[in-house]
């Protein structure tokens, strides 16, 4: 196979890895945690994975503490936790 063909194959495999959803067995345990606003009084839009609904939902994050099931964007939440 030529070097161009190898680069194309590598690019396609990388794209497949990025676009393939996370399976439930590969989902991090913290994706099962409930939304946690934290201790601070800020009002920052954030997203968390809701395991019963199997989707990412918005909540208001206080800005500190909380738990790892807390994402700045819905895309980041879906890439990490959604199947």
Curated annotation (Swiss-Prot):
The keyword Secreted applies. It is found in: Secreted. Disulfide bonds join 31-81, 40-64, 56-77. Residues 31-81 form the BPTI/Kunitz inhibitor domain. GO terms for cellular component: extracellular space. Pfam families: Kunitz_BPTI. Keywords: Disulfide bond, Protease inhibitor, Secreted, Serine protease inhibitor, Signal. One of its GO terms (molecular function) is serine-type endopeptidase inhibitor activity. Its main location: secreted. The record marks 41-42 as: Reactive bond for trypsin. PROSITE patterns: BPTI_KUNITZ_1, BPTI_KUNITZ_2. Expressed by the venom gland. Residues 1-24 form the signal peptide. Serine protease inhibitor. Belongs to the venom Kunitz-type family. This is Kunitz-type serine protease inhibitor superbin-1. The lineage of its organism: Eukaryota, Metazoa, Chordata, Craniata, Vertebrata.
